[in-house]
Amino acid sequence: MERLLINTIWRSYATKLTGSQVKLMARGLPKKQPIIGVQDIIVVASGKGGVGKSTVAVNFACSLAKLGKRVGLLDGDIFGPTIPLLMNVHGEPVVNDKNLMIPPQNYNVKCLSMGMLTPVETSVIWRGPLVMSAIQRLLKGTDWGLLDVLVIDTPPGTGDVHLSLSQHAPITGVILVTTPHTAAVQVTLKGASMYEKLNVPIFGVVENMKYTICQNCNQRLEFFKDSRISSLPRKLISLPLDSRIADSNESGVPVVIKYPDSKYSYLFTQLAEEITQILNEQRCNQNQNNSAH
């Protein structure tokens, strides 16, 4: 019975392409159009949910701003937006005379999220095409002004949002976020594989909730002695599990703003400086290649 069911499904889908499918495939992928005024686009992604990806995106964006960069932060999680809470930005954005949204700003970071366009208690129930259309609207229907970096916080997994961004926006690179859990690492490997197939550079991995610091003896306590993190692209930083980070998230004040002299602020500054160096090297190599031609 099971074999019959599999064969039936196979016959239903493994058929000759229709004329419309042939025409659609002949068009190829959409041509990536730059976002007006935006120099670099960095995606923050994860395979599993709950690994702290949005926390990393928010504090990374704020750390770039503290370095003097002009920064925007786009919440690409259409179904579960958290940027309004984490950045304490609420209310609908103003629309200018060109029908472009003006992103509100906090902590010197311009922010935009689907959470600003829908009531908190309202869920978004959309299929793929609507999600992809919403992402394009948030990206290109916004007056970002002049930005050095646009950070995009994406939903977990490898779904429509990731594909839409990769196909429509010139992504400079990706930062992957994971915890040391085997399950999280395995799914992050799948995400890395997807971006490699899409020819999007992977800057590295942020390992979150790697350890904690004992409040009594100040000793570093590792949660996972054996981890598969080494199977992922190069590690950028390892972050601790700490109640102050959770407290910062709840209060809408990123930890790098609330505790500017803390170890966490130092680590995120280190991340921002390293990514800035990578961007500078990329630009230098690109200029050299252009000169050679």
UniProtKB/Swiss-Prot annotation:
Subcellular location per the Swiss-Prot or TrEMBL entry: Mitochondrion membrane
Gene3D superfamilies, A to Z: P-loop containing nucleotide triphosphate hydrolases
Membrane topology: Peripheral membrane protein
Major localisation: mitochondrion
Key words of the record: 4Fe-4S, ATP-binding, Iron, Iron-sulfur, Membrane, Metal-binding, Mitochondrion, Nucleotide-binding, Transit peptide
GO cellular component terms, semicolon-separated: mitochondrial inner membrane; mitochondrion
Chain spans, region CXXC motif probably involved in coordinating iron-sulfur cluster binding: 214-217
Domain of life: Eukaryota
Cofactor binding description: Binds 1 [4Fe-4S] cluster.
Disulfide cross-links: none
Cofactor(s) recorded in Swiss-Prot or TrEMBL: [4Fe-4S] cluster
InterPro entries: Mrp-like_CS (IPR000808), Mrp/NBP35_ATP-bd (IPR019591), NUBPL-like (IPR044304), P-loop_NTPase (IPR027417), YlxH/NBP35 (IPR033756)
A Gene Ontology biological process term: mitochondrial respiratory chain complex I assembly
MF terms in GO: 4 iron, 4 sulfur cluster binding; ATP binding; ATP-dependent FeS chaperone activity; iron-sulfur cluster binding; metal ion binding; phospholipid binding
Protein's job: Iron-sulfur cluster transfer protein involved in the assembly of the mitochondrial membrane respiratory chain NADH dehydrogenase (Complex I). May deliver one or more Fe-S clusters to complex I subunits. Alleviates pausing in mitochondrial DNA (mtDNA) replication at slow zone 2. May be involved in mtDNA-helicase-mediated mtDNA unwinding and replication by transferring iron-sulfur clusters.
Quaternary structure and partners: Homodimer; dimerization is not reliant on iron-sulfur cluster binding.
Similarity comment text for this entry: Belongs to the Mrp/NBP35 ATP-binding proteins family.
Protein known as: Iron-sulfur cluster transfer protein Nubpl
Organism phylogeny: Eukaryota, Metazoa, Ecdysozoa, Arthropoda, Hexapoda
